[in-house]
């Protein structure tokens, strides 16, 4: 079965408070991770929460990268979803873990849009 994309869901633990709470730094790291993986960036949106935390998304031609941080816990939840086979989501994920200084990471990959033959042939949507 072929998949339309690969989605890596990562949990980053033991990251520094200051980096996870700095919206500009988080944005820079996320953008660089997309570029390091060979993605083409389309849009970038990040938000700083009060008293702490950052959420953001980097929309790429191949799909997206998203992050939500809990600086007080040294934790970041990361999604890297890529379509096609030109961008490896693990390249971006590993870059993020390194740049956020994660002491521990758990991650799993899910295939998205796995096309079951009977549905792949149909172009109509019947719900």
Swiss-Prot record:
Binds 1 pyruvoyl group covalently per subunit. The modification Pyruvic acid (Ser) is found at residue 63. The active site is at residues 63, 68, 83. Its cofactor is pyruvate. Keywords: Autocatalytic cleavage, Decarboxylase, Lyase, Polyamine biosynthesis, Pyruvate, S-adenosyl-L-methionine, Schiff base, Spermidine biosynthesis, Zymogen. It catalyses: S-adenosyl-L-methionine + H(+) = S-adenosyl 3-(methylsulfanyl)propylamine + CO2. GO terms for cellular component: cytosol. GO terms for molecular function: adenosylmethionine decarboxylase activity. Is synthesized initially as an inactive proenzyme. Formation of the active enzyme involves a self-maturation process in which the active site pyruvoyl group is generated from an internal serine residue via an autocatalytic post-translational modification. Two non-identical subunits are generated from the proenzyme in this reaction, and the pyruvate is formed at the N-terminus of the alpha chain, which is derived from the carboxyl end of the proenzyme. SUPFAM superfamilies: S-adenosylmethionine decarboxylase. It comes from the Bacteria. Belongs to the prokaryotic AdoMetDC family. Type 1 subfamily. Catalyzes the decarboxylation of S-adenosylmethionine to S-adenosylmethioninamine (dcAdoMet), the propylamine donor required for the synthesis of the polyamines spermine and spermidine from the diamine putrescine. Heterotetramer of two alpha and two beta chains arranged as a dimer of alpha/beta heterodimers. This is S-adenosylmethionine decarboxylase proenzyme. The gene is speH.
């Amino acid at each position: 079965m072929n998949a339309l994309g690969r989605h890596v869901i990562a949990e980053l633990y033991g990251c520094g408070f200051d980096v996870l709470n700095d919206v500009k730094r988080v944005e820079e790291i996320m953008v660089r991770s997309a570029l390091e993986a060979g993605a083409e960036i389309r849009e970038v949106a990040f938000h700083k929460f009060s008293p702490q935390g950052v959420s953001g998304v980097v929309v790429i031609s191949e799909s997206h990268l998203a992050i939500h941080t809990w600086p007080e816990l040294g934790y970041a939840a990361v999604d890297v979803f890529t379509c096609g086979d030109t961008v490896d989501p693990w390249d971006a994920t590993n870059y993020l873990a390194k740049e956020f200084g994660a002491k521990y990471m758990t991650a799993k990959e899910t295939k998205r849009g796995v096309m079951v033959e009977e549905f792949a042939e149909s172009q109509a949507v019947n719900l």
